[in-house]
Every structure is written in C-alpha cells, then in structure tokens.
C-alpha cells in the first residue's frame, strides 16, 4: 500500500538479513528504493517499520530509538525481551508503537486496564508446522508430526510464551502489554 502512494509517507529503503530475498522483493515495487543496513535505515528514515524476526528486534529498536525516531513493530515478544526499550525511548524522545494486527479489541483491553481486570486468558491455535523449531518444542522434545487435532503444548504467562515461542506469540505479548501485564496474562 505504501508503495502505491500514501499522503505524507514514502517507502524509502529496506533492510534485510538476506540480500537476495530483499532484491527479489524490490522487483515487486513500483518505486525503486535502496537496500540499506539497519543503521542506515534508522538514520535516513523518520519512521522505521519492523517486521523482522525477534532475534534482530533489539538491533532495530536500538538503532531507531538512539536516533529519537519512531519505531512501529509487530514484535510484542521483542518488547518483552527488552524491558529497557520504553525507558530508552523516553530518554531519547523516540516512540515505540506496537502494531497489534491480529488482535481485535485491543483498545477495549487498554481501556479496561484503566479500571480493574482480574484475569486475562488467551487461547492460541497454530498449525503444528508453525511451531517447528520453537524453543519450547525443542527443549521439551515435543513431537508435532502426526498431530491432527487440538493439542495443548504450552500453558504459561504471556512473558513465558514470548520466550518459548518468539515467532508465534506477538499477539499474546501485545495483550499482556496492553492489559494486566505480561506476567499475569495467561
């Protein structure tokens, strides 16, 4: 959508851990842009949109925040794993915006959190192949092959879930951040 034109916004560059993938993506765009390092993107842009895996969240966040820029991220798990992000953003007059995407009603949860919420429980369902390689699956020797019905593979807090399934629980992390906290959200 941004490539098609949005008033006041321009897609100017991308960063990627895999240059060949980024180059292939560039061929789909209407407007030519540059492939840059994370540092270069953060330096040249006013708003950095992060859709990268959690493993590079801290690098992207630090590069953006240290320059007092705006970071829009989908990585609730990355925010939970880097608790100093909010403090750093305040100190540098930067902003961190968690794009909540798949979680309808998050504004209602935020509003309710101004009052009293006694408990928040979230049930997440994922296809087994989406969980392959997740730390919790590997560490607990959970076999995903042959699963053909709903099976509980994890119970815990949103914070624990973010560590156990860093690529799969950004929605739960966002719910925890918006509501009663990542440690109390189940």
What are these model-predicted stretches?
Residues 1, 51, 55-59, 81-82, ...:
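Short glycine/serine/threonine-rich phosphate/pyrophosphate-binding segments
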Residues 102-186:
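Active-site-lining helix/loop region of Rossmann-like oxidoreductase modules
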């Amino acid at each position: 959508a941004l490539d098609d034109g949005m008033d006041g916004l321009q897609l100017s560059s991308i960063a990627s851990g895999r240059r060949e993938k980024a180059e292939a993506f560039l061929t789909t765009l209407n407007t030519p842009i540059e492939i840059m390092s994370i540092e270069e993107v953060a330096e040249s842009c006013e708003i950095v949109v992060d859709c990268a895996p959690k493993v590079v969240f801290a690098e992207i966040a630090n590069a953006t925040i240290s320059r007092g820029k705006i970071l829009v991220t989908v990585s609730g798990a990355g925010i939970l794993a880097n608790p100093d992000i909010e403090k750093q953003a305040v100190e540098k007059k930067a902003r961190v915006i968690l794009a909540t995407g798949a979680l309808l009603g998050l504004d209602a949860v935020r509003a309710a959190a101004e009052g009293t919420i006694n408990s928040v429980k979230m049930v997440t369902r994922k296809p087994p192949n989406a969980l392959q390689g997740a730390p919790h699956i590997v560490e607990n020797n959970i076999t995903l092959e042959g699963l053909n019905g709903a099976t509980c593979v994890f119970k815990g807090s949103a914070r624990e879930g973010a560590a156990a399934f860093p690529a799969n629980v950004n929605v739960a992390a966002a719910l925890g951040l918006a509501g009663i906290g990542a440690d109390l959200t189940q």
